[in-house]
């Protein structure tokens, strides 16, 4: 991977509320910002911006609420129309929580969607007119691949593309970037079998390269009123490939996931009494 410093270039673009030509907008925005894509660059595109370009915007008032959604919405203090959409969009719903936010009780469902564990199946109500919600792109990996192909056709450059989104790390406050989809380079670098500095063979380490690049891009793209749904990440050192990627290239079975596997097992087997507070009479450093 790269040893030279990374460069991250923010690219502002027009605010969109309905379906539009994403490829033309990207090219026009690059020109307006004086930014140039180079071969080997990675273009980060907000998954929400891509979804809006596909018309993936829903008026909540148009969503018919099922009895199941109404029950869950009441239990977790959620908008019933939003709850219905979550149930329709999620690949799996693990459960939900409610908590107080500035004196208001609010709730969320924890879901699995497109290989990502996230609240409310990734549905986004920010930076969109009130009463509307933005879904994920209909098919994220082909969307990323199409952006890559269009940039190659229109600008003559071979690049990588990531669709960026935000997620929450378990037990941590604050959102971070995650790559919803990748095109043009392997999103995960397998380090298993390699030798570390002390001669130890790596047994389980696989580096989330696409996610790491996404985090860099999110630093300049922002989350609120920045109007920067695009970013160029330069000198990542990724090797470009033409393979069609899918969620299978980044996801793992739930039983292999340290979070899902452990928490699911923990519902049946409480190991807390077996966990020592001290080791050999001394606090563990």
Q: Model-derived features: where do they sit?
A:
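N-terminal and secondary-structure boundary signal
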Residues: 1-285
